[in-house]
Design a protein with these regions (language model features):
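Short, solvent-exposed loop/beta-turn-alpha elements that line the ligand-binding surface or hinge
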Residues: 13-17, 38-65, 94-125
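A general marker of short, structured functional hotspots
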Residues: 7, 15, 26, 32, ...
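Bilobed periplasmic-binding protein-like "clamshell/Venus-flytrap" ligand-binding domains
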Residues: 22-25, 67-102
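Extracytoplasmic/periplasmic, Sec-exported soluble proteins
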Residues: 2, 6, 25, 47-55, ...
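Periplasmic binding protein-like
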Residues: 1-41
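Short secondary-structure boundary micro-motifs
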Residues: 22, 32-33, 47-50, 76, ...
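Extracytoplasmic/secreted envelope proteins and their assembly/folding machinery
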Residues: 7, 11, 15, 34, ...
C-alpha cells in the first residue's frame, strides 16, 4: 500500500526509520569517493535505513587515514562491495547546473560534483 503524507512529516519519518521504501535528496560535497561511502556508516545522520555493518564502518574509517593510494583505492572498492551487496540502497545521482564560459577560456574542467579544476586552463585570443 502506498501512503502519502505531508512534506514536513516525511523527513521525520525517514529520520526515525518509519518507512518501507523512501527516496531522499543528497549530493556529493567533494570530489572523492568517500563522500558517498560515508553515507553508509552506521553513525551517519543520513543513514535513514539504520543499516549497520561493523566491517564496513572499519573499512571506511581506515580509508580516512590510509596514506598509500593503492591500498586506499582497494579499501574503497571493498567497502563499496559490502555496501552494494549488503545494504538495500540504490544510489541515483542526477545533478544539473548551467555554466557560462567565455569561448576564449579553454581546458576548464568541471567535474560532476561541481568541483572545478583550473590546472590546465588557458585563455586564447
Amino acid at each position: 500500500m502506498v501512503a502519502t503524507t505531508k512534506q514536513d512529516r516525511i523527513y521525520n519519518k525517514q529520520k526515525n526509520g518509519d518507512f518501507d521504501l523512501a527516496t531522499t535528496r543528497w549530493g556529493p560535497d567533494y570530489g572523492d569517493p568517500t563522500t558517498y561511502l560515508t553515507m553508509g556508516i552506521s553513525t551517519n545522520s543520513n543513514n535513514y535505513g539504520k543499516w549497520s555493518n561493523s566491517e564496513y564502518d572499519q573499512l571506511v574509517d581506515q580509508v580516512g587515514v590510509e596514506s598509500d593510494v593503492n591500498r586506499r583505492w582497494q579499501e574503497m572498492k571493498d567497502a563499496e562491495k559490502i555496501l552494494l551487496d549488503d545494504y538495500a540502497y540504490i544510489p541515483v545521482f542526477e545533478k544539473g547546473a548551467a555554466t557560462l564560459q567565455n569561448p576564449k577560456v579553454k581546458n576548464l574542467v568541471i567535474k560532476p560534483c561541481r568541483t572545478i579544476s583550473f590546472e590546465y586552463v588557458e585563455k586564447t585570443e
